Amino acid sequence: MTDIDSSRRKFLISSAAGISGLVIAQSSLAGTVTNLLDPGSPLMLPENFSPSVWFTMQSSGETTIHVFRQELGQHIGTAFAQIIAEELELDWSKVSIDYPSVDAAIVAETGVQLTGGSASVLQSFDPLSRAAAVARQFLIDSGADILGSEPSDCYAENSYVIDPIFDQRISYGQILAQTVIDHKIQPEELAEVQLKRRPDYKIIGQPAHALDIEEKVNGKARYGIDARVPNMVFGKASLAPTRLGSTI
């Protein structure tokens, strides 16, 4: 199978400087680079790898999953990553997670930013799956264009778009180095996208190394009890020493 070299350029405008990323569920701010074809008219490109609501993909091939729930030791971050990696057909070795701070824009997009009732995976499975599936199709469309193939002839696997007819493939990283995919997913796209069948799952249901296990073991992970603010004081409830003790 032929790997397409990342120096190939079929998207002239969006290939400038080779900085690009796939931002899902949130339009990014725009940065400027010089338009070499018309120096007086700068090209508008998304900021390099601006965080999105659900995940951010980079031309390095890395994907960061943004977990907008509180981690209490139940490994919801790894679960979210597995859900997205499954539909997006990611190379699991290049997936990481982070836990963004509470933000009004994020709450407006997701509707809620809390954890409770053991409902994180239950409530997030479908929206995460659909966002990843739509993104996969974006990548297939762009990858097929670079390969000179028909999108319907291509499929995604292990962070590659593959054309089995002409025996060639291109990695997600190479695609993002050659073009900018700056499209805000629309509700109708989420509703209509075709999700994978359970028998086709490769990541969900399989043993997986917790992506944040090192931080939890070495003490680097920060929990609510670790929070500190200026002039913070500590308090303790004063209780009667016996169950039926007098009110204090």
What are these regions (language model features)?
Residues 2-24, 31-248:
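Cofactor-binding beta-sheet edge motifs in enzyme active sites
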